[in-house]
């Protein structure tokens, strides 16, 4: 890394430590030319896969769209914001763990349903009714029966 003071190419790392729950590395560096010290932070560049919609259109993963869908299902339910954010982080981790550059929306939807099932059964049924396009009350009953198994 170039020195921010004299633009020299050679710097050495004096100290490294994990910060932000281990998601960042803080490094103290010293320039070998001017001896000035400075701090850098290193984070992994985590790229989420693109999403393939049902009409084969590809678009970047949209975390805000995911959050809106989950919050709509969880409206007026006793689930904390922290629990929702944890679920969103878990879904993103699962998507990254696929190692794929593109994933179908069906996979994202199924991950959301799994997360909602753990968070709140009513929210799960709300989301499933829209996601799976329930046509009548019988389909609601069948899904509720599956939840009780």
UniProtKB/Swiss-Prot annotation:
A zinc finger (unnamed) spans 3-34. Residues 49-139 form the ATP-cone domain. GO terms for biological process: negative regulation of DNA-templated transcription. The keyword Phosphoprotein does not apply. Keywords: ATP-binding, DNA-binding, Metal-binding, Nucleotide-binding, Repressor, Transcription, Transcription regulation, Zinc, Zinc-finger. It holds the Pfam family Zn_ribbon_NrdR. Its cofactor is Zn(2+). Binds 1 zinc ion. GO terms for molecular function: ATP binding; DNA binding; zinc ion binding. NCBIfam families: transcriptional regulator NrdR. Belongs to the NrdR family. PANTHER family: TRANSCRIPTIONAL REPRESSOR NRDR (PTHR30455:SF2). Negatively regulates transcription of bacterial ribonucleotide reductase nrd genes and operons by binding to NrdR-boxes. HAMAP family: NrdR (MF_00440). This is Transcriptional repressor NrdR. It comes from Yersinia enterocolitica serotype O:8 / biotype 1B (strain NCTC 13174 / 8081).
């Amino acid at each position: 890394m170039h020195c921010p003071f004299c633009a020299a190419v050679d710097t050495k790392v004096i100290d490294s430590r994990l910060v932000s729950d281990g998601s960042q590395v803080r490094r103290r560096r010293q320039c070998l030319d001017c001896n000035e010290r400075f701090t850098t932070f290193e984070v992994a560049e985590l790229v989420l896969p693109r999403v393939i919609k049902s009409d084969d259109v590809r678009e970047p993963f949209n975390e805000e769209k995911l959050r809106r869908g989950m919050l709509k299902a969880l409206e007026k339910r006793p689930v904390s914001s922290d629990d929702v954010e944890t679920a969103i982080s878990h879904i993103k981790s699962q998507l990254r763990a696929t190692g794929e550059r593109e994933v179908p929306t069906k996979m994202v939807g199924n991950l959301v349903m799994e997360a909602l099932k753990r968070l709140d059964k009513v929210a799960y049924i709300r989301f499933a009714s829209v996601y799976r396009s329930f046509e009548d009350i019988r389909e609601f009953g069948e899904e509720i029966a599956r939840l009780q198994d």
